[in-house]
Amino acid sequence: MSASLAFVFPGQGSQSLGMLKELGAEKPVIVETFKEASDALGYDLWKLVQEGPEEQLNQTDKTQPAILTASIALWRLWLEEGGATPAFVSGHSLGEYSALVAAGSLSLKDAVRLVERRGQLMQEAVPAGHGAMAAILGLDDAVVVEICGRAAEDEVVSAVNFNSPGQVVIAGNKAAVDRAMELCKEAGAKRALPLAVSVPSHCALMKPAAERFAENVNAIEWKAPQIPVVQNVTAAIAPDLDALKHDLLAQLYQPVRWVECVQTLAANGAVNLVECGPGKVLAGLNKRCADGVTTYNLNTPDAVAATRAALA
């Protein structure tokens, strides 16, 4: 175990058609992990990830199992090749489920079914076109929170992802998000960018989904994590399994406190972070979240080799 090492797992937005293709051709564990997930889901997930159609891969109930499986395939590859066990794990949004699989808290089979259901319930909670998300760049967190309070009126809009200093994602009813974007621009935001997502994650509109999802979460067998998991809702390590599950459900309708998650890792000595997933989204965020933090990647054969060499 390496005390300075933490693995961080990305959420939605890291998917791309053909992800892990090169590694899949070289390392049997990649395709084997996808086969295990496919058997649990009842369709060929590797084929979908490699061949598409892309619109299907980008549906949240397909995206979530795809990113989780890709992340766990890379985790297994890391361990298989003698990589050190991290002192901590954490995941951004959906990535929290990948982190829990890595920590031994739930099986891959249960996890892919769980996040598929999570995607279905999220989609059902808000009809297509009624919800929206947007990234606000260049304003303080407190300003964005205050603007959302004003823009909501009788609808929902709130700050839902604190991704890095000066980068906050908002979500809610489409009209309220549009109002908040305009107010953010007036307040001096560098940019207010609508995100191409079908579901307004981590806001109050997801509370009904969380209530329904509790049944699925409680129906599977959980184990105490073998590696401490820093969770999104608290930016802390849950004291027990009940608290962990509670915070996992709350994450559906409460903000992802990613800046604080990275700061918690760094404060505990974990300054070498490995982004265990198919993209490099977190690497871009992490360096702005805490001083002295370095993020390594595993998304290509070259990245795996470079990370192994750097952390040997």
Where do the PLM segments sit?
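FabD-like malonyl-/acyl-CoA
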Residues: 1-144, 195, 272-302
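Non-catalytic positions within long, well-ordered alpha-helices that form the structural scaffold/packing
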Residues: 79, 185, 266-269
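Short, charged, surface-exposed secondary-structure boundary motifs
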Residues: 304-310
